[in-house]
């Protein structure tokens, strides 16, 4: 088991900065030297660690050292088999898991109030949505989560579906019974995908709703920046040991 006290990327960046390396590559601000206005705004400490992928800092496209170790630490913290760092928001994590499980013409069962990133994934990959109406709380005027009965009905009517997609929670904080839905999906040979853009804290608090990985989800897209305290756009794609990693390829480098 890896130490949860470690921060491999942070440690590597501090060491890199201490070496006072003169960069001859991107980014163009050259650790702040080339853009004094931005350096004044963000601070020199920030600018000197905004650097490109290099051997000491690893590469997100094919991590072999500090990024790989950091992802392993994250996976253990979230109770997942694997964790992949995402640098362009949970939108990319949602799209990655949807594209991984369903090819063109194949079905994914999902609530009608999914995030538009899930809809865009269907458009990109050509998968077919089977919508489940989540219902509406008339007093509050907000959409709810999917009921187990409605999901079961959708599964029985679409036994060829490849996955069930669950918001855990919805934008308004409503949770479906993700454990029962995961069990239903698996009983019919389907993956369970959890959009946990607003559920990062479920993994680290007492008396919280059940987190996706603990409920048996095969994939979970987790927004670290929304309730995890990290910078905007940072996210994780978590996978369980039920997932063949050849289904997934995250190709977002730290710097284009």
Which residue stretches match the model-derived regions?
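N-terminal "arm"/small-domain region of PLP-dependent enzymes with the aminotransferase-like
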Residues: 1-65
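Short beta-strand-to-turn element immediately C-terminal to the catalytic PLP-Schiff-base lysine
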Residues: 214, 236-241
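Active-site phosphate-binding strand-loop segment of PLP-dependent enzymes
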Residues: 140-200
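Conserved beta-loop-alpha segment that forms the PLP phosphate-binding cup at the N-terminus of a helix
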Residues: 82-107, 120-121
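Residue-level detector of conserved catalytic or cofactor/ligand-binding positions
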Residues: 245-256
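PLP-dependent aminotransferase-like
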Residues: 106-166
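Conserved active-site segment immediately N-terminal to the catalytic lysine
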Residues: 206-225
């Amino acid at each position: 088991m890896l130490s949860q006290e470690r921060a491999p990327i942070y440690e590597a960046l501090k060491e890199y900065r201490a070496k006072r390396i003169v960069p001859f590559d991107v980014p163009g601000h050259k650790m702040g030297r080339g853009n004094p206005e931005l350096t004044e705004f963000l601070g020199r400490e920030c600018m000197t660690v905004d650097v490109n992928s290099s051997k000491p800092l690893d590469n997100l496209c094919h991590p072999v050292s500090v990024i790989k170790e950091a992802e392993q630490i994250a996976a253990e913290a979230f109770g997942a088999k694997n964790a992949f760092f995402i640098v362009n928001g949970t939108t990319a994590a949602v799209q990655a898991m949807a594209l991984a499980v369903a090819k063109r013409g194949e079905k994914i069962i999902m609530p009608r109030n999914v995030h538009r990133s899930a809809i865009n994934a269907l458009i990109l990959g050509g998968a077919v949505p089977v919508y489940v109406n989540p219902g509406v709380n008339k007093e509050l005027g907000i959409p709810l989560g999917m009921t187990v009965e409605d999901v079961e009905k959708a599964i029985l009517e679409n036994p060829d579906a490849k996955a069930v997609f669950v918001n855990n929670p919805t934008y308004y904080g409503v949770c479906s019974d993700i454990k029962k839905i995961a069990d239903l999906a698996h009983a019919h040979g389907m993956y369970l995908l959890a959009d946990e853009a607003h559920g990062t804290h479920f993994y680290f608090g007492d008396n919280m709703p059940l987190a996706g990985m603990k409920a048996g989800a095969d994939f979970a897209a987790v927004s670290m920046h929304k309730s995890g305290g990290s910078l905007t756009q940072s996210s994780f794609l978590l996978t369980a040991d039920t997932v063949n990693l050849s289904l997934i390829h995250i190709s977002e480098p730290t710097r284009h």
